[in-house]
Amino acid sequence: MNIKKFAKQATVLTFTTALLAGGATQAFAKETNQKPYKETYGISHITRHDMLQIPEQQKNEKYQVPEFDSSTIKNISSAKGLDVWDSWPLQNADGTVANYHGYHIVFALAGDPKNADDTSIYMFYQKVGETSIDSWKNAGRVFKDSDKFDANDSILKDQTQEWSGSATFTSDGKIRLFYTDFSGKHYGKQTLTTAQVNVSASDSSLNINGVEDYKSIFDGDGKTYQNVQQFIDEGNYSSGDNHTLRDPHYVEDKGHKYLVFEANTGTEDGYQGEESLFNKAYYGKSTSFFRQESQKLLQSDKKRTAELANGALGMIELNDDYTLKKVMKPLIASNTVTDEIERANVFKMNGKWYLFTDSRGSKMTIDGITSNDIYMLGYVSNSLTGPYKPLNKTGLVLKMDLDPNDVTFTYSHFAVPQAKGNNVVITSYMTNRGFYADKQSTFAPSFLLNIKGKKTSVVKDSILEQGQLTVNK
């Protein structure tokens, strides 16, 4: 038995009893000599107070994903027989869309609609200047089945699916892909992974000529970011926990290379567990709000989910050869709020750093947020490493609440910075996979989001073509 862990649980139990009896802080201090604590661990937090403001705030149309006309939505013609969902463009170091020999490139997850385990990365491309969804061509799968074995990597050989990531156009004209190696063989082990993708160009097409320098980068250290062994030790799926270490997003700053990614906090920066419910830093606002909200949470059916909620947008520094150089603190964490903040995305715009993430209401512990609610949250800082403050006072940037069965349901919203101006293009996928015989998961119509300092708003009447990446304004 872990005596330290047992002692910590006993302390928490005493405080829980005191709170339920209405004694709050004074009773707890008298019985155990300890008090509710406030520990930020030197990172920014998505607080319960901010999130509780969102159900009212989201009624404003400037935060709402536009309504789309289902009769105009097309499957991707070059992806016949495939659902296509999470996607990301080949980007320059500053986040703008790269021009690769006259083409824009998008990497996307795709698979057989009838087989939920069929998840691989495909490469799509479109001539610069074209915007129609029918102009997207399909170069096929990035990786051959044999590549993971040929890489001579002990983690890669157990990969069963390829999950989301990012891609950068390097200064020497190469395509460097980052993605998530998912292994169904090891309780959902997830590993940040990279490869150079060799692509040849002609006047009419792009062709994948294999990959090289294919290797694992990071699978969690346990201290800063939860690893799969901790998930297993605590009961794996039966525990109700949700282990994440995925969606690597590449970014450069001042000559340094980094990955920002979805994760869960580790044992040294605010781990999951009942004791986390008594950290004032996770609640925000004031001590009186903490007392009221913590008592309510302790008596609610969301208590167990909140205990396990320790989502984070993590960060590591890379060497020039894209190996791990340094494990860094998370940019932001969502302890007690949600265990899952996805599709990490960060870029510099007009002198500020903007950090975005997608999340589902069904994974949250906030009153007033429903299981159908879909969000893109956003944060702003003067530096890449933070501290980050919520955009629009709460972090709400986009909200969508369509039934998952709706053809125009969208998720995986991704902000693409433009070369000029204050608008970014929002891409996403439309239609959940495997729901319809004739409607596949496809590129959703893009639209514009305006960013000015600490505020954002959806630009009215700004719906673009399906999968459109850039605007000439």
From Swiss-Prot:
Effect in UniProt of substituting residue 117 to A: 2-fold decrease in catalytic efficiency. Synthesizes a bimodal levan molecular weight distribution
Primary localisation category: secreted
Binding residues annotated for Ca(2+), in chain numbering: 241, 272, 308, 310, 339
Result of altering residue 344 to P: Increases transfructosylation activity
Highest taxon, organism lineage: Bacteria
Binding sites annotated in the UniProt record for sucrose: 85-86, 164, 246-247, 340, 360
Leading EC class: transferase
Residues under site feature: Transition state stabilizer: 247
Localization of this protein: Secreted
Signal peptide stretch: 1-29
GO BP terms in the entry: carbohydrate utilization
Outcome recorded upon mutating residue 243 to L: Decrease in catalytic efficiency
Keyword Transferase: yes
Assembly, per entry: Monomer.
Function (record text): Catalyzes the synthesis of levan, a fructose polymer, by transferring the fructosyl moiety from sucrose to a growing acceptor molecule. Also displays sucrose hydrolase activity. At low sucrose concentrations, functions as an hydrolase with water as acceptor, whereas at higher substrate concentrations it adds fructosyl units to a growing levan chain.
Name the UniProt record assigns to this protein: Levansucrase
Protein's gene: sacB
